[in-house]
């Protein structure tokens, strides 16, 4: 604080901010208060925003240099609004007692204070660069002032429109609050007396529209004294006149009383004609209410005229109105669709609830979650029920609804050809029988004379069509036979009359019974001399197949594929059985069926042999088969003819799929590519999840961990298998898996349908695997790549040879068997200690013979104490290779000398024998 009161002057003319400036201080310097009466002149560069002053107002004249403190009393009209304002002499004293950062400007003619330190000299001459900088700053300030003027004009227009809306709302509220107005009218005389001295007209708060103002007029209407607060309120640290303060306290008390039963603070009060108003004409500060100054920034508490915006007041008014009306909203119950998993945020949006409310409910239930957390459908259903909504559960599998297993009406069903599967043991003549029926020669084109693919054909008998499915009879093709039995209506069990019932015959019977299809027994090869059909019938009885000739219900026909005997009777039996079954299907619907076989053709791409079971398949339609989809490019029959459509029970080859489906997959026609892609992606994701679950289960299960620990020492034979069709690859993988033992097993690194490519060679090189091609070949680039890298490629067309070669190769990985052969025993008679040799045992051969270099065991009291090899074997002084029984010899062990008389030396030979699987 300073000790002198003469070095300051207070300027209250107009609405200028009170500042303190030393004498002689030029523009751009600021007096900084250092505390305890110390000051410091600081040269600064400031950017001032000059408010736009209306043209009709005159600029505020500076205070006369020699004027005393009382000279500041004459003020503009807004300041003279309160005649009871006392002399400002106490304000000077108060200003000396309360230090602030803003001091009144100091007149230049006054002498410097004695207590001030020497001020730094500020040069009045500026350099050209500084002048340019000031000019630029002045130009920027003028541009900003122009923008502020435009912005203020727009704000005034907006607030004028808001004022009209506000007054309309106030008029509505006035009708509901007539009782409170009567109370305020009764109190009006008491309030009007202290306000009568002020020159402000009472009509200032009438409903007449006011001119737009930069600052909100709502606070002015709420507190009349606040409108002129920046002008009437003394500077920080000055004394407030008692009369003004008392009147303001009374007014604030009045407002608080009205807030209890009327509008809350911050809201605009309705026009009240009977209530005296103490407002003053708007001053320059009110017009610049929207501009932030030091004075307005320091204003806080209830005197702040810019407490809230019109939007905030409207919100509070609306909130208060809702509270007065006490309207209860009716709860809207919605149907919430819940997938298998959903986030809390998504659930709240579907319920049209706040996520915070859902989080609060979960916290009450003891679960701390965030809006982004994922919950299952059960918990989501509980939450939705708690909030009063209904739930409809859906899952990802719903994308397949309406595609498979669609029921047909009885009126739409028509007769269809029967689907017949030929099953039986290998080499019992299944394919030959089908060739005889089709008048074709498929057997001659098969490698090894055995069927290794599943084939579908259609023949016509007496104007009726019959669809045949030929399955392999080899033991490796169990899955193919099972698929054939599932897709068929009638199963023909082919049994050779000279070979009778065999293992695959029994398996075929079980597949047919599991599929629930009727069986027709075809006893083949009856033209042979050793044929015995009755033996076949008797053996079938052991497996619960009772033929008609034995009192059963199963049809049996003796046929010969070679001579064509009784083939017509077999076809008649098939048609008779089909008539009994009354096979029907709906041809006027989207197609649905089963994939019989699939392969990757080099020229045609992915080719799938399908059996249409329902509907009609046409080119151009979009189908989904397993996890692949595509648009049908062409339909090819078993004879190679292109057809325009394929009805129920018709086997065709489909071209145009995006990939090679698995044999046995269901296919169906969908309406759009997007639907097909969605189903395909869902099935692929499901397959990945299952694979991941299997891997995680293997890692987590204790039993699996023990098995993995045991399998650490198992040797693996890595293979890359490429085949012509998916069924063959499946059969090869199953056959190789059965070859595995506890010591060695085949590991299939990769398998697929199609030719051998360079990527297969690269994979085999990385995994050190051999490549097996079944009925496929490697292209030129792949073959050259394999030769450079030394990768072995083996080609096979018969599954027997493939399995035998892999079995032999895996046998080479087995450790050889160690076999011991007993040679003889010798008893130690005496032990001699010979220099440079060590201990030598004098022995007599009591059984067999003793050979040098053979393995020996030293047995003492029937306990083996040492096992090793003979270091020397002598008879007398000569080294010998062997000593027969009954003779004496001298023996010494390698790295062992603890020999005693009476010990027995057992001599044996070790042989390593190669093992096979």
Swiss-Prot record:
Compositionally biased region (Low complexity): 63-113, 185-203, 215-244
Q: Which gene encodes it?
A: infB
Q: What is this protein called?
A: Translation initiation factor IF-2
As recorded in UniProt, coiled-coil segments are none
User: Where would I find the tr-type G domain in this sequence?
Assistant: 415-582
Q: Which SUPFAM superfamilies did the record assign?
A: Initiation factor IF2/eIF5b, domain 3, P-loop containing nucleoside triphosphate hydrolases, Translation proteins
Give the residue ranges for region: G5.
560-562
G3, as annotated region: 470-473
Q: Does the keyword S-adenosyl-L-methionine apply?
A: no
Q: What does this protein do?
A: One of the essential components for the initiation of protein synthesis. Protects formylmethionyl-tRNA from spontaneous hydrolysis and promotes its binding to the 30S ribosomal subunits. Also involved in the hydrolysis of GTP during the formation of the 70S ribosomal complex.
A single Gene Ontology CC annotation of this entry is: cytosol
Name the positions where GTP binds: 424-431, 470-474, 524-527
């Amino acid at each position: 604080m300073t000790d002198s009161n003469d070095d300051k002057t207070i300027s209250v003319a107009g609405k200028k901010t009170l500042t303190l400036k030393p004498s002689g201080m030029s523009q751009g310097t600021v007096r900084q208060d250092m505390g305890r009466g110390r000051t410091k002149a600081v040269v600064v560069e400031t950017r001032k925003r000059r408010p736009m002053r209306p043209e009709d107002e005159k600029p505020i004249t500076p205070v006369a240099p020699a004027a005393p403190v009382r000279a500041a009393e004459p003020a503009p009209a807004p300041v003279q609004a309160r005649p009871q304002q006392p002399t400002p002499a106490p304000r000077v004293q108060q200003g000396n007692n309360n230090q602030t950062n803003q001091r009144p400007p100091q007149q230049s003619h006054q002498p410097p204070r004695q207590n001030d330190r020497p001020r730094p000299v500020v040069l009045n001459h500026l350099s050209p660069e500084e002048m340019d900088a000031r000019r630029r700053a002045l130009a920027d300030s003028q541009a900003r002032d122009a923008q502020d003027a435009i912005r203020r004009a727009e704000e005034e227009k907006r607030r004028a429109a808001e004022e009209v809306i506000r007054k309309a709302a106030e008029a509505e509220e006035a009708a509901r609050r007539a009782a409170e107005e009567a109370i305020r009218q009764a109190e009006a005389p008491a309030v009007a007396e202290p306000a009568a001295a002020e020159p402000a007209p009472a009509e200032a708060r009438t409903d007449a529209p006011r001119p737009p103002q930069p600052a909100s007029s709502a606070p002015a209407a709420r507190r009349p004294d606040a409108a002129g607060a920046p002008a009437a309120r003394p500077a920080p640290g000055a004394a407030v006149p008692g009369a003004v303060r008392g009147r303001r306290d009374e007014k604030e008390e009045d407002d608080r009383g009205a807030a209890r039963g009327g509008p809350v603070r911050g809201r605009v009060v309705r026009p009240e004609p009977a209530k005296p108003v103490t407002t003053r004409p708007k001053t320059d500060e009110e017009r610049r209410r929207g501009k932030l100054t030091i004075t307005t920034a320091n204003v806080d508490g209830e005197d702040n005229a810019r407490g809230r915006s019109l939007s905030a007041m409207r919100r509070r008014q609306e909130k208060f109105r809702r509270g007065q009306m006490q309207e209860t909203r009716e709860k809207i119950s919605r149907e919430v669709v819940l997938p298998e998993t959903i986030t809390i945020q998504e659930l709240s949006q579907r319920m049209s609830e706040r996520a915070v409310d859902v989080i609060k409910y979960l916290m009450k239930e003891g679960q701390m979650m965030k809006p982004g957390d994922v919950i299952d459908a059960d918990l989501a259903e509980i939450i939705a029920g708690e909030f009063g909504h209904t739930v409809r559960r859906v899952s990802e599998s719903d994308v397949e609804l309406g595609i498979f297993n669609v029921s047909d009406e009885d009126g739409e069903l028509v007769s269809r050809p029967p689907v017949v599967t030929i099953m039986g043991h290998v080499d019992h003549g299944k394919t030959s029988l089908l060739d005889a029926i089709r008048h074709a020669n498929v057997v001659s084109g098969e490698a090894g004379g055995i069927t290794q693919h599943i084939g579908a054909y259609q023949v016509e008998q007496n104007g009726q069509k019959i669809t045949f499915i030929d399955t392999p009879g080899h033991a490796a093709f169990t899955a193919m036979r099972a698929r054939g039995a599932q897709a068929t209506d009638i199963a023909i069990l082919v049994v050779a009359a000279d070979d009778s019932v065999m293992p695959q015959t029994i398996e075929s019977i079980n597949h047919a019974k599991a599929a629930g299809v009727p069986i027709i027994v075809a006893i083949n090869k009856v033209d042979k001399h050793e044929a015995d059909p009755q033996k076949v019938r008797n053996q079938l009885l052991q497996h619960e197949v009772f033929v008609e000739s034995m009192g059963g219900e199963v049809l049996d026909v003796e046929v010969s594929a070679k001579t064509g005997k009784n083939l017509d009777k077999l076809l008649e039996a098939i048609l008779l059985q089909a008539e009994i079954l009354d096979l029907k299907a709906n041809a006027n619907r989207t197609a649905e069926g089963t994939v019989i076989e699939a392969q990757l053709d080099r020229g045609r791409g992915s080719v799938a042999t399908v059996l249409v079971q329902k509907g009609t398949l046409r080119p151009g339609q979009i189908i989904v088969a397993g996890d692949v989809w595509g648009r049908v490019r062409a339909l090819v029959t078993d004879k190679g003819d292109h057809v325009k459509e394929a009805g129920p029970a018709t086997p065709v080859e489909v071209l145009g799929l995006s990939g090679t489906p698995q044999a046995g997959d269901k296919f169906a026609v969908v309406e759009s590519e997007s639907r097909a892609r969605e189903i395909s992606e869902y099935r692929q994701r499901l397959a990945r999840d299952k694979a991941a679950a299997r891997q995680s289960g293997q890692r987590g299960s204790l039993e699996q961990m023990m098995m993995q620990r045991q399998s650490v020492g198992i040797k693996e034979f890595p293979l890359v298998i490429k085949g012509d069709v998916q069924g063959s690859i499946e059969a090869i993988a199953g056959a190789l898996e059965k070859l595995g033992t506890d010591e060695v097993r085949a590991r299939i690194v990769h398998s697929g349908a199609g030719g051998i490519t360079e990527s297969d060679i690269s994979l085999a090189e990385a995994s050190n695997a051999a490549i097996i091609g079944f009925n496929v070949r490697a292209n030129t680039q792949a073959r050259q790549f394999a030769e450079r890298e030394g990768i072995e490629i083996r080609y096979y067309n018969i599954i027997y040879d493939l399995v035998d070669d892999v079995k032999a190769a895996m046998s080479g990985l087995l450790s050889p068997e160690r076999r011991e052969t007993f040679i003889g025993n010798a008893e130690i008679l005496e032990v001699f200690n010979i220099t440079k040799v060590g201990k030598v045992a004098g022995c007599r051969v009591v059984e067999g013979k003793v050979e040098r270099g053979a393995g020996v065991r030293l047995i003492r009291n029937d306990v083996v104490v040492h096992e090793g090899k003979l270091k020397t074997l002598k008879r007398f002084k000569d080294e010998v290779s062997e000593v027969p029984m009954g003779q004496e010899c001298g023996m010494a062990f390698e790295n062992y000398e603890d020999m005693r008389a009476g010990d027995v030396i057992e001599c044996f030979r070790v042989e390593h024998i190669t093992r096979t699987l």
